[in-house]
Regions:
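Pre-Walker A adenine-sensing motif
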Residues: 1-7
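Short coil/turn segments at beta-strand junctions that form active-site/ligand-binding loops
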Residues: 12, 40, 104-105
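The catalytic "switch" region of P-loop NTPases
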Residues: 53-55, 104-106, 126-185
Length: 185
């Protein structure tokens, strides 16, 4: 809990990994609720991942343009999203800078992150590196099953720059129903 909160408010890059049923989604819900109840000025961006899959044959992969659109739409509702990649990137940076200067922080949370394509993982590094002067504009929290840990392994040369910047926290599996109920309630 504390690690996720710290990541959200301090511009960190974090992956939360656990087996199905280990409480990952509950932790995400608690984070969003804690930020709201504490009155913290953190805008949480949660791209829709309803039909997300790693490849086209199994569903629709979540790509960098979709993430940029989600950030722009959440941080600056009603703002049009430019179709060209260059203009979209400029608009994204502009809305994050303006929002940051207005006193807000931003946290991108992606559930089912184990289904992210490697190209999208690489693009997340670029999102995370957006700054206004020395101030980082976006925290990133990836939430996924154990396959995400495999993707973020130091043996994955495709995403080594992401691996070097992303902290990975592994949730232990819930062994007893009582443990789960105590965690959940």
């Amino acid at each position: 809990r504390a690690t996720m909160h710290d990541a959200a408010v301090n511009g960190n890059f974090l992956a939360v990994v656990g087996e199905s049923g280990s409480g990952k989604s509950t932790l995400r819900e608690e984070l969003v609720e804690r930020l709201r109840l504490n009155g913290e000025s953190v805008i949480v961006v949660e791209p829709y991942t309803l039909s997300m899959a790693e490849s086209e044959k199994n569903g629709k992969p979540l790509r960098a343009p979709h993430i940029a659109e989600a950030i722009i739409s959440t941080v600056s509702p009603g703002t049009s999203v430019p179709p060209s990649p260059e203009m979209r990137a400029r608009k994204l940076h502009k809305v994050l800078v303006e929002s940051s200067r207005a006193g807000f922080r931003h946290c991108l949370v992606i559930e089912e992150a184990h289904d992210l394509h490697m190209h999208t993982l690489k693009a997340l590094k670029r999102f995370w590196e957006l700054k206004d002067g020395m101030r980082r504009l976006l925290s990133i929290i990836l939430i996924g099953q154990t396959e995400l840990k495999d993707k973020l392994s130091s043996t994955q040369s495709d995403v080594r720059e992401v691996v070097q910047r992303c902290d990975v926290v592994e949730l232990p599996p819930v062994k007893q129903p009582g443990d789960f109920l105590a965690f959940r309630f």
